[in-house]
Amino acid sequence: MAVARAGVLGVQWLQRASWNVMPLGARTASHMTKDMFPGPYPRTPEERAAAAKKYNMRVEDYEPYPDDGMGYGDYPKLPDRSQHERDPWYSWDQPDLRLNWGEPMHWHLDMFNRNRVDTSPILVSWNVMCMQLFGFLAFMIFMCWVGEVYPVYQPVGPKQYPYNNLYLERGGDPSKEPERVVHYEI
């Protein structure tokens, strides 16, 4: 028991001693630098120009989110367009996100990536889609009504049974010979 306790204390001492020398790999991989965080909301034209340069944008195109206390800071307000609308044949630096190096990402990129919301314009208007849907449903209801009013059956002949039309099974007298039933003529 004492050996196990000494081993645990030794491991804890080693962890504390190595903490100041070299941080764990998971902590360094998840660490964000100060350049990755948005800065304070730009109040002057010089601050707007510096923020536009920080995000590789022209000053004319740069517009920050409104300073409403949500913590957006100087991050640029990009148009709410999904990545479906971006050119799929362009040679992107990051093709799965359709982004180039240094290009600012949308604040809600997790919502506008290619397997989520598609904001690309639809080819058919909602009025036309609704007309087609309800027209098809009305046609199918009409056809079901016609089928109920005017039923159609396959023409059939009389039922034919083997063994002299099942004479014994239908209660015929076994002592009498049943009359022969011919189902066809050659």
UniProtKB/Swiss-Prot annotation:
Instruction: Please provide an example of a Pfam family that matches this protein in its UniProt record.
Output: NDUF_B8
Taxonomy of origin reads:
Eukaryota, Metazoa, Chordata, Craniata, Vertebrata
Instruction: Name the source organism.
Output: Pongo abelii (Sumatran orangutan)
Q: Which UniProt keywords apply?
A: Electron transport, Membrane, Mitochondrion, Mitochondrion inner membrane, Respiratory chain, Transit peptide, Transmembrane, Transmembrane helix, Transport
Q: By what name is this protein known?
A: NADH dehydrogenase [ubiquinone] 1 beta subcomplex subunit 8, mitochondrial
Its placement in the membrane is given as: Single-pass membrane protein
- Per the record, the major location class is mitochondrion
Localization per record: Mitochondrion inner membrane
For biological process, the GO terms are: mitochondrial electron transport, NADH to ubiquinone
**Family as reported in the entry's similarity comment:** Belongs to the complex I NDUFB8 subunit family.
- Name the residues that span the membrane: 133-153
Report whether Transmembrane shows up as a keyword of the record: yes
- Function (record text): Accessory subunit of the mitochondrial membrane respiratory chain NADH dehydrogenase (Complex I), that is believed not to be involved in catalysis. Complex I functions in the transfer of electrons from NADH to the respiratory chain. The immediate electron acceptor for the enzyme is believed to be ubiquinone.
Coiled-coil regions, chain positions: none
Q: Is Transport there in the keyword field?
A: yes
- Quaternary organization: Complex I is composed of 45 different subunits.
Per the entry, what span does the transit peptide take up?
1-28
